[in-house]
Amino acid sequence: MQDTYRHQGLRKRLVGELRNLGIKNEPVLKAIEKIPRHFFVEHTFEHDAYENKPFPIGRGQTISNPFTVAYQTELLELQKEDKVLEIGTGSGYQAAVLAELGMQVYTIERHQPLSLKAKKLLEGLGYGKVKTYFGDGFKGLPAEAPFDKILITAAAPEIPKELLKQLKIGGLMVIPFGEGDTQQMIRIKRLDNNEFEKETFDYFTFVPMLKGIED
């Protein structure tokens, strides 16, 4: 698969659309303009990869639409070389955005085929420093904690307590919360060992966050 001038032009158009939708973070927009999203979607959807749409990637999972990726990334308020844990690798696109922004990225996926595919793709695109893990996202990565930021890319029916424990004091977690057809984006800041501050944002639609693993 190639990344052509046509693809680059479509990415520029997409970035303009994201600006119009309210995304203001220039580094995030530049990352989206650089990363070839058509590499991360199934071949069937390649020609539509730069539409602001989600697409199925197998195993009942999706690649989020670019606005959602930009929105969540913006809410993280990333600082240089933040250590970021992503729950739900999926296609690997969100991890690529974080890596392009210069973050230390740890990403975990409960579906082994998706995890292996994302790892190979990220390495092929020059994002080999991203650390990919096959495992249960509800458990996080306690051996690698604490994290400056934690990003959940699936709808959580509850705030995972194990993940809160893995957040640095002063750190932020961004999570779509709820079990209905739409979920509210929430940002949680850890103020102290047992004290957290919660902010609420817009509503989105995500696949559910599930416990356990699938080979």
Would you name each region that the model predicts?
Residues M1-L85, Y93-V97, L101, L114-K117, ...:
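Class I SAM-dependent transferase core
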Residues E77-E197:
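Conserved nucleotide-cofactor-binding alpha/beta core module
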